[in-house]
Amino acid sequence: MSADQRVLVVGAGGLSSPVVRLLAERDIAQLTIVDDDVVDESNLHRQTLYTDADVGYSKIERAKIAVEAIRRGISVRTVEGRFLPETAMSLLRGHTMVIEGADNLATKFLVADAAHIAGVPAVQAGAVRWAGWAFCALPGSACLRCLFEDIPADRIETCAEAGVVGPVVGVLGALQAAIAFRLLEGERPRGELWHYDGLRGALRRTLVRRRGDCPLCNGEIQDLRVERYTAPCAA
């Protein structure tokens, strides 16, 4: 694995907690973490990167401290703010891949679109209650829109509202890290979709094919218009 790899992590919550911990142990050139939230006591059961002592502090500030405690000398860049249409392309620039762990569909689709346009691999995931998914999109392979098409017109519950079992988030975050490691090692897991059912303890892999009518894959989406990502959603 080349030591000049640079990884962008969008979100520093439950999904990203195992991702950040595991990436901190790898020989990468830089880890960039983007988030605009503070550590909340009610989320500690799934945001395992933090402890009681971190409550009330900026997530990216405490995430950087945690990473540097795991591996001294690692370059950690923190960006306090959201991954937005007007900043997405500049944040992606120079990175080997993006790993997304946000808690809203608008950000998930924005990351997918921006990564596709920039030609950057994207590793994404989501979890609600006892189940979740992890997905890997590479340039030329199926994208998130091939899988979910678009942000639903009707508001849907996020994990913060519907609830999520902490270990389920941990499993999905670890899956993201595993996919990222494979990418860093030179593998190309095109269109891999992993489903995890925590109630049954079942993990299943399927391969997603590109849809002929996918607006992102067929080039209809070539920019990041704000109105594309303004469906009702929680932060």
Annotate the PLM regions:
Residues 1-235:
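Adenine nucleotide-associated cytosolic modules
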